[in-house]
Amino acid sequence: MIASPDFVPLTPDEYLKHEAQSLEKHEYRDGDVYAMAGAMDEHVTIAGNLFAELRQFLRGSGCRVYISDMKARVESINRFFYPDVMVTCDPQDQETAAYKRFPKLIVEVLSESTEAYDRGDKFADYRQLESLQEYVLVSAKRK
């Protein structure tokens, strides 16, 4: 998303309200909102397969698995992301339906347009989550 000269940063609450009504997904970084591109077939298939395997593996554990329509909130640095797959086991995450604050696992399926960001700035942002134990990057190129 290209910011206009008249752009006014959004508060997290304004972002969540806008996102609930939007037809497309946006990431939020300290007041700035960025539209996300749609994913390709291979990307969606990999994320879906990981979701299905993790859901089956974690059944009955109290953990929940979410796919790319659930936001992860990094509250300490004022960020919202849409991970491809996310696992949370913290009961506090059941208090909010629009986002999760305590993921243990985040998986990103790499694409050419996002790989550098997923490995760099986004990873640095995710490291601010005290609950995060694993950050997994999956290449759609390798077989």
Explain the meaning of each model-derived region:
Residues 1-143:
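Gly/Pro/Ser/Thr-rich low-complexity, intrinsically disordered segments predominantly at protein N-termini
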